[in-house]
Amino acid sequence: IWRREHIQYWEGYYKYEDGINYIVKDGKDIPVNTFIGCDPATDIDTKHSDFSVITVIAIDVNNELYVLEYERHRSVPTIGSKNPETGEILGKKGVVDIILELHQKYNCVSSTVEDVAMNRSIFQALNDERRRLNKFDIAVIPEKPGGTQKRNRIYSGLSARFSTGTVHLRKNMFDLIN
């Protein structure tokens, strides 16, 4: 288990130049690969609903992980309603819209979405939207939860990374810190 003192912080920014993703940290360009992870909530819209979380990470050659951005919302639709003539989103963005937007913004290698029965509509909507936009370069990988309790999966996956100081958050990422 990790503690607050295990949390590493980073200051810098992301850039894409000549077909390569970088984070710029301490004035140095560090080449990285970028990925998205998504844990969509599947419960109904209440004040106690779970959060849907979509996180963009960068990983460098030394396997250091930098959290670039995350979206954390309650009661997010699978996909937002769109104007049929312009394709412009009307109202609230959905999980699919956010994934596709972040995938393009950060030139991600792939996006992983937790694959449980209730999330199958997300995969269907992602495939439909990729087809509509002709964006077949966007790779979305289903991730089976594996039968262990969610808390155990989180701790086993992140504990070693945090305790060895290889996860770097921004100081303003309060939801991830607390």
Tell me what each language-model feature is.
Residues 60-178:
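Mg2+-dependent endonuclease catalytic cores in nucleic-acid-processing enzymes, primarily RNase H-like
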Residues 22-29, 44-48, 101-105:
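Short, conserved, surface-exposed binding loops centered on an aromatic residue
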Residues 34-35, 51, 64, 166:
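A residue-level signal for beta-strand positions that form part of recognition/binding surfaces
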Residues 1-41:
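ATPase catalytic-site recognition across NTP-hydrolyzing enzymes
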Residues 36-37, 56, 112:
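Structured core elements
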Residues 38-54:
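An active-site-proximal beta-strand-loop segment
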